[in-house]
């Protein structure tokens, strides 16, 4: 009975973490899309909140790839890493269910 309860708790925790990663990936997508729009003032609401939420994560990947035609593609590494984490969590979640 205790093992069953632990599996249920683990399943809930993994589900919450996976959904958080998906929401964060969506926020990153919005951030990168809005970065292409030149007229956005990042120091007004609601953009500053999005910037403060996503910049610490994106800063981990900045400078890892050289600029290509003046564009920074290091955020793609952030997307790729977060997608891999989501896939890993989903596979663990599926293994726990079955």
Curated annotation (Swiss-Prot):
UniProt KW Plastid keyword: yes
InterPro entries: CCB3/YggT
Record's keyword terms, sorted: Chloroplast, Plastid
Cellular compartment(s): Plastid, Chloroplast
Pfam family, one: YGGT
GO biological process terms on file: chloroplast fission; nucleoid organization
Protein name (database record): Uncharacterized protein ycf19
Organism, scientific name: Galdieria sulphuraria
């Amino acid at each position: 009975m205790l093992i069953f309860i632990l599996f249920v708790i683990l399943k809930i925790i993994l589900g919450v973490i996976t959904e958080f990663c998906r929401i964060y990936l969506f926020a990153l997508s919005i951030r990168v899309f809005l970065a292409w729009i030149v007229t956005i003032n990042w120091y007004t609401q609601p953009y500053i909140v999005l910037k403060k939420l996503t910049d610490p994560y994106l800063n981990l990947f900045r400078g890892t790839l050289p600029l290509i035609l003046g564009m920074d593609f290091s955020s793609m590494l952030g997307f790729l890493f977060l997608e891999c984490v989501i896939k890993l969590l989903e596979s663990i979640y599926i293994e726990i269910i079955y």
